[in-house]
Design a protein with these regions (language model features):
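Acidic, low-complexity proline/glycine-rich segments
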Residues: 1-26, 278-283, 321-322, 327-334, ...
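C-terminal amphipathic alpha-helical interaction region
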Residues: 102, 460, 475-596
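A short core secondary-structure module
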Residues: 190, 194-248
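A glycine-rich, basic-preceded beta-loop-alpha segment at the flavin cofactor/substrate interface
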Residues: 199, 237-254, 259, 266-297, ...
């Protein structure tokens, strides 16, 4: 069903030419031995696995879905998923970006990130089984006790066990302060946890022998609200001292959800009836610990939409070159055929270029953020680590919300290229649209990401993170402002930077008297800032392409054309968005609720 070819050439461009990661790695002691050959080899081997093993299971997994056995409370994944997971584990892919102390290969986040894109292009639903495990690994690595780390991290790193996060309950999604699950202390340092969780991705399955659930619950003396939530490690099977599986813990799947998309992943209702767990971190500080998992998941969701955008674009492009319909408006382009390929039609090209631009822009941004994580975690200079952490915090909601919004747009446009055939399941395009839709919802809705960006990441620190990033943009604009060949990119970039600064100040002043101004402006505001980031990166990539314009490699010609399309056709929506963000809250809040 369709095709997927990992975009290795563009990944290499981003890593080697745009980010020059091997030079960056020289300043990171853990990665000084990572060279271009290692990077390229990982990309090539990752492409083989995702193209040959995972992609063939994508459409069949969507058709078959997961099967729940109410009698045994077990879930069977689609045909081939379990075998593919074994190949993934046997190939060492689970350990790629993990700490060697726990059996990992210790490769950079920025390299693992590219492989993760391939996984999501090939099969998003399957990728969620190991993908969530990495978030559990990060959370335990930072907040787990020495005993928890020793007992669980090697198994998570190897892929023998998988992980989940259990946050949501029927009455509380975004507002976790309403959470009701309870944890009763036992005399031996463990806790018995009771409650019900919903929407738990990969909560029950057959691909691994054990599942490590990270569960939010309240202790008996917990304060009300979000300040009274603790985090617990609750394994499906309680491990014995030697690491073998012991007693079955009473945390069971009660049902799996019927969903719009990601049918190959089990979205579970999980019931805990006195399940044994151990505390992660400090009592009542569970959200602090869980945010390590959640932030990793938010970046991962952006990668999911990047992956879907890429594979949808690839298939739409093949179709547009093969499908013949009508003649070109400017005269026949294939006179030997009864009609021209539809790629000659301007609006078909608009749809294709929209997906292409959103894929290439997202790849650059996600790779940049991954490199900043490498710097944050490994650079010997504390100031550099702090700067990198600030950029990761600023850009995480952009990756989660802007890229997933774009993924919905891009997969829809790619399906539209097919006309009526795109709406038919056998072509596979409608699956990408269905799968992409959840990415705007889970791991914090895109509205919540917008509030996080404007309210917490920008206004709460008086715009310090945004200004620091803006200084980089300003320096680039000043450096290239006199280069006529760059004016079509640098001029709009500089103008948007100034507009974002003024808009931020205006919204901040309004918020002093009415906090609804933040909520009213947040969604269009995030999209404007997303375009600012994309504009900055497209301008930099265009500069590289211009420097290689005399090359025989047509890749650079394509890269330059994509940047020009972005600034001509996608960037202009910022004018509308700025007007929306500045329009105030009255047009939303004045109408009485009874009059809706």
């Amino acid at each position: 069903m369709g095709q997927y070819v990992a975009p290795i050439r563009d990944m290499q461009f981003v890593l080697h030419e745009f980010l020059n990661v091997t030079e960056e790695f020289k300043n990171l002691p853990a990665y000084q031995e990572i060279d271009a050959d290692i990077i390229n080899q990982v990309l090539e081997e990752g492409a083989k696995f995702t193209q040959e093993v995972l992609f063939p299971l994508n459409h069949s997994g969507d058709r078959e879905g997961c099967h729940f056995d109410a009698a045994t409370k077990t879930v069977t994944t689609p045909k081939g998923f379990k075998e593919a997971y074994k190949q993934y584990v046997d190939g060492g892919w689970a350990a790629l970006g993990c700490d060697p102390e726990y059996g990992g290969q210790g490769l950079p986040v920025s390299l693992n990130n590219s492989f993760y894109e391939m996984l999501n292009s090939a099969n998003q639903a399957w990728t969620m089984y190991p993908g969530l495990s990495h978030g559990a690994y990060e959370c335990l690595k930072e907040h787990g006790s020495d005993e928890q780390k020793a007992q669980y991290l090697p198994k998570l790193v190897s892929g023998e066990w998988t992980g989940t996060m259990c946050l949501t309950e029927a009455h509380c999604g975004t507002d976790l302060g309403l959470l009701r699950s309870k944890a009763e202390p036992q005399g031996d340092g463990t806790y018995k946890i009771s409650g019900s969780k919903i929407f738990i991705s990969a909560g029950e399955h057959d691909v691994a022998e054990n599942i490590i659930h990270l569960v939010l619950a309240r202790l008996p003396d917990a304060p009300e609200g979000s300040k009274g939530i603790s985090l617990f490690l609750v394994p499906k099977f309680l491990p014995n001292a030697d690491g073998s599986l012991g007693e079955r813990n009473p945390i069971f799947c009660g049902a799996i959800e019927e969903k719009m998309g990601i049918h190959g992943n089990a979205t579970c209702q999980m019931n805990l009836d006195g399940a044994v767990g151990t505390l992660i971190g400090q009592p009542h500080k569970g959200l602090n610990a869980m945010f390590v998992f959640m932030n990793a998941a938010r970046l991962g969701v952006g990668m999911q939409s990047l992956g879907l955008t890429e594979v949808a674009y690839q298939n739409a492009l093949v179709y547009a070159k093969d499908r013949i319909q009508m003649r070109s408006l400017s005269g026949p382009k294939a006179p030997d055929k009864p009609a021209d390929p539809i790629i000659v039609h301007p609006d078909v090209r608009r749809m294709l270029l929209t997906a292409k631009a959103y894929a290439e822009g997202a790849r650059a941004v996600c790779s940049y953020v991954a490199l900043q994580i490498d710097r944050e975690l490994n650079h010997p200079d504390e100031d550099v680590r702090k700067e990198a952490a600030g950029e990761v915090a600023l850009l995480t909601p952009i990756v989660k919300a802007f890229i997933t919004d774009n993924g919905w747009i891009a997969t829809s446009e790619a399906m539209q290229v097919y006309g009526g055939h795109g709406y038919i399941s056998e072509w596979g395009m409608e699956q990408y649209v269905r799968d992409a839709r959840i990415n705007m919802i889970y791991e914090g809705t895109n509205t919540i990401q917008s509030l996080d960006l404007l309210g917490r990441k920008i206004l709460m620190d008086n715009g310090a993170k945004l200004r620091a990033f803006g200084e980089k943009i300003k320096a680039f604009v000043e450096e290239n402002g006199l280069d006529e060949s760059m004016s079509e990119f640098v001029t709009p970039l500089g103008e948007l930077g100034e507009k974002v600064g003024k808009m931020t100040m205006e919204i901040g002043m309004k918020a002093f008297t009415n906090q609804d101004e933040v909520g009213a402006a947040a969604v269009p505001y995030l999209r404007v800032v997303g375009h600012l980031v994309f504009s900055y990166f497209f301008a930099q990539m265009a500069k590289i392409a211009l420097e290689k314009k005399d090359s025989d490699d047509k890749f650079y010609e394509s890269k330059l054309a994509t940047a020009r399309f972005y600034f001509a056709r996608l960037y202009p929506e910022t004018a509308m968005l700025i007007r929306q963000a500045r329009s105030g809250s009255a047009n939303l809040m004045a109408l009485d609720a009874d009059l809706f």
